[in-house]
Structure formats: structure tokens, C-alpha cells
Amino acid sequence: PSHYAYVKIAEGCNRKCAYCAIPIITGKHVSRPMEDILREVEGLVHKGVKEFQIIAQELTFYGVDLYGKQCIAELVDRMAKIEGVEWIRLHYAYPNNFPVDLLEVIRRNQNVCKYLDIALQHISDHVLSNMLRHTTKEETISLIKKIREDVPEITLRTTLMVGFPGETQADFDELIDFVKWAKFDRMGAFAYSEEEGTYAAINYEDDVPKNVKQSRLDRVMKVQEGIMTELNFQKEGKVFKTIIDRREGDYYVGRTEADSPEVDCEVLIPHSEGALNIGDFYQVEIVSADTFDLYGTVVEQSA
């Protein structure tokens, strides 16, 4: 759809997580100059784009190579001041050395979605160490608490990996307990598979049996589905600013601030309610919910 766009602010990654081939494929992190990005956003606004998905393999490193410091907060703050930018959404932050000044920018700017996609991968110190993640359970939990303290309404999305070489049942149980505690709004999970040329492929034996990986993946997703269902039910009766993406069958399909295109929940609004404009914002009351979808009715069109 022409009302949202993906804006890549950097290419490559300097981190060397054991399982990941991205640095091998894309090379070192290279930030785009800030003025270039802002010009691109202004150009897209003129073409009718309202929502901007800001993407990079590693957002939080943005600017270090160009300006000698983390500049993601400054970039987002400047982007938010561009007239016509309705929503800015951030994808793929890294927990280690997270720039906490970004939280203030998210909190302060109405048009920066209270949404953060931060891939944590695991919580067991043993697995995090084997993954070369350079962070700990304690640091991860502190960061989640800090994010939620500073931006109470934030939607947190994460990605987890099960079955990494050396993952024991105790490690996995720790991960499940963490998922239950953290109650992530959105989560993707994967079973480890070896990527050629990576540190893990060269140095570790892929020793968690395939069936164990699958059962762990099923288990973590089942726990998460329960959490998402509960969180979605809590939205019933509340009103959310919603962007309309498309018409499908008997429904208009939209998303709230808490939902990124193609990966998160959607809001279904019966088109018997009347014509809605694709790409426009409406205030929508959620009348019912299930694990992956919300069902709503339009209260008013947003300015």
C-alpha cells in the first residue's frame, strides 16, 4: 500500500552473534547520512505516505560510524517534526548498549508509535553467552523494566530462538518462565538451524534433536498465544487510532499503533458500516478480540 513505507537507515551489522549470517552477507554497519534519510521521508510524505517503518539490521548502532555516537534518538526526533508524518515505527533494536534517550523521544512525540521491536533471542545466561550476545539475563530484565517504566503504554515485540546448541531443558524452562513474566505484546520464535560460515556452525555441534527443537518451539508459542489472547481481550471496549490498509471480503482491515504491517494483529471492521478510505486513520472501538485479530466499529474519522 502507498500509505506506509519502509525506510532503511543503515545496512550491515557489526555484531557477531554466533548463529547469524547477516554480517557475513551484508558486511559492517554503514549508517546513511541523517539529511539523506530526512529528505527521503519528506519526499515520501509528498507522495502520500503517512506511516514510516524505520528499519536496519541494528537500529541502535545508527550514527556511530558517521557521527561517533548513537544518533537514533536524534534522527527519530527530527523525523517526527516533519509535517505529514503520522506514525513512525522502529524495527530491530538490540538490547546491548540500548540508547535510553530514545525512550524519551518515543514518549514525547505523538507520532512516534509506542512500539519497539527488540530481538532478545534468549534469557538463560548460558545460552546468551554461547550465542555471543554480550548481554545477561539481569541486564535484559532491567532493560525491559526501564522501557516499560519510561513508556508505560509501549508495545514490545521480540524474537526468540529455541534449540540453540547446548540449550538444556533447564535453559528452556528459564526461557518459558521469562516469557510468562515479560508478557510480550508480540513475539516471533524460531528453532535454531545452522547457517553456513557462522561461528555456531564452525564451533558448535547442532546437538538439540530436531523433535526436541520442534516441541520447544510449539511450547513457547503456545504460552505466547495465551498471553496475546489475554492482552487482546483487555482491549475490548477501548478506542484506538487505526489506519485502514485494505478491503478484504466483508471487512476493512486496519492496524492500531501496536501493530506493524504483515507481522502483527489486524483490526477487522465490517464494511456494512459504510465506506472507509484506504490509508486514512479512524478512531475504532474494539468490540471483540481473539488471539490474532481485533474486531472493531468506527467511532469517528481521525484528523
Which residues make up each language-model segment?
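Terminal RNA-binding accessory module
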Residues: A200-A303
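Canonical Radical SAM [4Fe-4S] cluster-binding loop centered on the CxxxCxxC motif
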Residues: S2-E35
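Conserved alpha-helical substructure of the radical SAM core
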Residues: I24-Q53
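Conserved, mostly hydrophobic/aromatic
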Residues: C17, I37, I54, L90, ...
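Radical SAM enzyme [4Fe-4S]-AdoMet core and its adjacent flexible, acidic
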Residues: G63-V85, N130-M131, E194-G226
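Conserved SAM/AdoMet-binding glycine-rich loop
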Residues: H46-F172, K180-W181
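AMP-binding (ANL) adenylation modules
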Residues: A191-E196, N232-F233
